[in-house]
Amino acid sequence: MYQFDRKEYEKRMEWYQDARFGMFIHWGLYSIPARGEWVRSVEEIPEEEYLPFMKEFDARDYNPKQWAKEAKAAGMKYVVLTAKHHDGFCLFDSKYTDYKVTNTPAGRDLIKEYVEALREEGLKVGIYFTLLDWHHPDYPHYGDRIHPMRNHKECGNENRDFSRYTEYLYNQVEEICTNYGQIDIIWFDFSYDDMRGEKWGATKLINMVRSLQPQVIIDNRLEASGEGRGSLYECDPTPYHGDFVSPEQIIPPEGICDKEGNPMVWEACFTMNNNWGYCANDHYYKPASMLIKKLGECVSKGGNMILNVGPDAKGKFPKESSAILAEIGCWMDKNHDSIYGCVPAENIPKPDYGRITRNGNKYYVHIYENTLGPLPLLGFDKDKIVKVRALDDGHEVPISNAWMHSDYPDIAFVDLGPDPVLPDPVDYVLEVEMAE
């Protein structure tokens, strides 16, 4: 029986908090209609109209080795793929359903190939697994808030046995935990209304998961969702507590602490465009420059960032996504020390020009916008500054002695040189080493 132990928990979370940056991948049958992963619910598509997509799912361009290489090149340390999303279709070979990838033209277990590809690149393996299942006959249909058949009285729930569904859920999660070696992250999704906690058989489920995968990290969505924080926040963890909070499509304004004011582990998940699953008409991509800054913001507040890619119907990353990943990777190549293993810079105020992260006695000043005149290092004890260097190439950045800041004798200023345009106009990083 699993019981929360603070020391074991903190040890389990070490690699994850050091990693700071991961990739989410949403891929499934919904990639064929290409109108987002919730298409069946949003458009209330009947089962008989959705099932034919199985005949088209051939995974022709599925190349998890390429996925892994792009994630690694972008500076990501872990990847989470949807083994099953809410439509109930499985990318793995489950013995408990025929609604699976081995019964499509793809004809093979895609999760097996995925985990092998990640391990070859030294990436941590994450599996997303939904708690919902719009395909299963015992999952509530009519009257459920989000089921595709929610408005169809003929799909009533009189003969549905939810205990059969939770047994099915348990069995499939057991397959995931048994058949694919070490799983580093299980990303459950999601609780809503009264569908939370023990409604899912959560204690039994987590006891099984933690017995088979004792070091696995689990999100908080057995008891919460993109909103809500779970029992760790209440300082009274249930057996199925989340290891991290999972804010969705938002970065917390001030990071996240529990009720007693202790920092919590969290991960902001968001999309590159406006959909998780492939959407052919959604070309509203966030620029790489924005996402680089958001990564720095997450780390400066004590969180991780997991950035989504939605492969197309054939399994290929959209060209826009690949270009964004490559651009982020160029920045990470030079500046990863300001991300990996970093934490908030306590007692240092957020500067007007950017963000600050810290690793030990080294502070990383992320400059998004240059200042007029020398750049102030507010909150730094100027007598304890050992040196200041540009992180990208290591050159010395001198402490300024200019006359224009003589009215501020207690504040350290640095001289970035005569050019008002930053060497990196997106996020130019200084490494400030302080005396220990």
Where are these regions (language model features)?
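Mature catalytic domains of secreted/periplasmic carbohydrate-active enzymes
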Residues: 1-436
